[in-house]
Amino acid sequence: MAEEKSFPMTADGKAKLEQELEDLRLVRRPEVINRIKIARSYGDLSENSEYESAKDEQAFVEGRISQIETMLQYAVIIDNEDVAADEVSMGREITFQELPDEEPESYTIVGESESDPLSGKISNESPMAKGLLGHKVGDTVEIEIPNGSMKVKILSVK
């Protein structure tokens, strides 16, 4: 029997997915259905770009609904109660310094569905997060990244 993939995420990440799902079901889906109905009224569907566009959007919306439903069904909410306060784990903000003397950087490790590196949120599946998870403040860690490796010192965990 195939093992189902779990989707680790923060409670905030789950709430955002639930909100997106509600928006897709209650707003976007009806809008697309209405666009299809209007486009059909134009007649010949074989050369109807509005109809094709609306059908493409419908496929996207339905695909995203299905994707979110699966993620929520197999969501695993991260709970750090049993993790030491100075240990790197999901849902925590980590500040580290690339050695020997780079400027400190801070990221929060989140589930794949929540990752947004430009907002300081990296996926638990990223090489950086995988290298940091489980280590503690003060540890120096060598992390394998796509173009080699880097050595970092963990400065803080919040």
From Swiss-Prot:
Keywords tagged on the record: Coiled coil, DNA-binding, Transcription, Transcription regulation
PROSITE patterns for this protein: GREAB_1, GREAB_2
Sections of the chain in a coiled coil: 49-69
Gene name of the encoded protein: greA
Originating species: Limosilactobacillus fermentum (strain NBRC 3956 / LMG 18251)
Family of the protein in this entry: Belongs to the GreA/GreB family.
Protein name: Transcription elongation factor GreA
Chain spans, region Disordered: 102-125
Keyword GTP-binding carried by entry: no
Classification via Pfam families: GreA_GreB, GreA_GreB_N
Gene Ontology terms, MF aspect: DNA binding; RNA polymerase binding
Function as written in the Swiss-Prot or TrEMBL entry: Necessary for efficient RNA polymerase transcription elongation past template-encoded arresting sites. The arresting sites in DNA have the property of trapping a certain fraction of elongating RNA polymerases that pass through, resulting in locked ternary complexes. Cleavage of the nascent transcript by cleavage factors such as GreA or GreB allows the resumption of elongation from the new 3'terminus. GreA releases sequences of 2 to 3 nucleotides.
GO biological process, one term: regulation of DNA-templated transcription elongation
